[in-house]
């Protein structure tokens, strides 16, 4: 990514989360939560934690912590992860209970136990996340949150990881900032394991009249002003509005993702099309 954009994000890092929440009226928090909950359901359906598996309750057989033979580790990458909000939400949602009921997971280990159809226990383990971003200023904000994660400064189009390193990749409001979205999709496909998921939460180029009016008329009037007032960086929030208008529509993005090998599992529209959650799957049959 170009250095002026990196410099811009470094300059707003300390106020980034606050302004995201403020400018979206805290809707961005709900959007992330929805995405993580839906990923959990997808993972259950596709066999990472089967929906037809019963949960470990007080009446179910207990399993020693060191004797879970069928443990499935979830390797998480929060790409363009900034301050780590998406990864933090993912872990909180995962540790709050299984996909099919309200049974609690172990907050110390980040695990959930299930019973398979034959009665054997299996455990679902979330490993420490990797939070990757090109801005060292944004990554510096990860540590104060005490997130169980490793921060890595990287280029989303050329990541320092081997193939099939992750089971889940999150990308929240970062795809617009990559010079080559196709290149970022192909690279995400490369490092994602077969059967894994890429979730893209993004402001796509508006496609209906209301959203075109909002982003082309209303947003340029108040978003840069509010951004300047709270961060002193008006140019960063002018860039935000312009990057949305210049970006792909959600339909064009999904078409591009399919051309890169992904299956589009779901497109979720938030708040009338202000933002979208796109859930992409790398086929199990992928080499």
Model-derived features: positions:
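Class I SAM-dependent methyltransferase SAM/SAH-binding core
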Residues: 75-107, 119, 123-158
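C-terminal alpha-helical "lid/dimerization" subdomain adjacent to the S-adenosyl-L-methionine
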Residues: 204-260, 266
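A short acidic, Gly/Pro-enriched loop at the edge of an enzyme's catalytic core
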Residues: 157-169
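Conserved alpha-helix/loop element of class I SAM-dependent methyltransferases that forms part
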Residues: 25-48, 55, 67-72, 89
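Core SAM-dependent methyltransferase catalytic element
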Residues: 261-287
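N-terminal, positively charged/glycine-rich alpha-helical extensions of SAM-dependent methyltransferases
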Residues: 1-17, 219
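A short glycine-rich, Lys/Arg-flanked "PGG" loop and its adjoining helix->strand segment in the class I
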Residues: 182-197
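Hydrophobic beta-strand segment of the Class I
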Residues: 16, 169-170
């Amino acid at each position: 990514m170009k250095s002026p954009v990196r410099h811009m994000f470094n300059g707003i890092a300390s106020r980034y989360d606050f302004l995201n929440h403020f400018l979206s009226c805290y809707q961005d928090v709900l959007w992330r939560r929805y995405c993580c909950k839906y990923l959990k359901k997808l993972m259950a359906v596709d066999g990472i934690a089967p929906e037809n598996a019963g949960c470990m309750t007080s009446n179910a057989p207990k399993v020693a912590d060191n004797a879970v033979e069928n443990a499935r580790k979830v390797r998480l990458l929060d790409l363009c992860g900034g301050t780590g909000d998406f990864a933090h939400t993912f872990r909180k949602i995962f540790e709050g209970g299984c996909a099919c009921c309200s049974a609690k997971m172990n907050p110390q280990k980040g695990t959930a136990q299930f019973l398979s159809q034959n009665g054997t226990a299996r455990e679902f383990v979330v490993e420490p996340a990797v939070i990757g971003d090109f801005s060292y200023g944004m990554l510096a904000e990860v540590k104060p949150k005490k997130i169980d994660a490793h921060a890595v400064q990287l280029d989303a189009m050329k990541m320092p990881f081997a193939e099939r390193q992750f089971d889940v990749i999150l990308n929240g409001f970062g795809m617009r900032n990559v010079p080559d979205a196709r290149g970022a999709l192909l690279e995400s496909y490369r490092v994602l394991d077969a059967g894994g998921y890429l979730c893209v939460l993004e402001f796509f180029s508006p496609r209906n009249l209301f959203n075109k009016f909002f982003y082309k008329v209303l947003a340029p009037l108040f978003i840069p002003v509010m951004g300047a007032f709270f961060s002193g960086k008006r140019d960063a929030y002018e860039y935000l509005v312009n990057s949305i208008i210049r970006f792909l529509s959600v339909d064009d993005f999904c078409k591009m993702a399919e051309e890169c090998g992904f299956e589009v599992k779901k497109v979720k529209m938030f708040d009338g099309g202000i933002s979208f959650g796109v859930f992409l799957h790398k086929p199990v049959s992928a080499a």
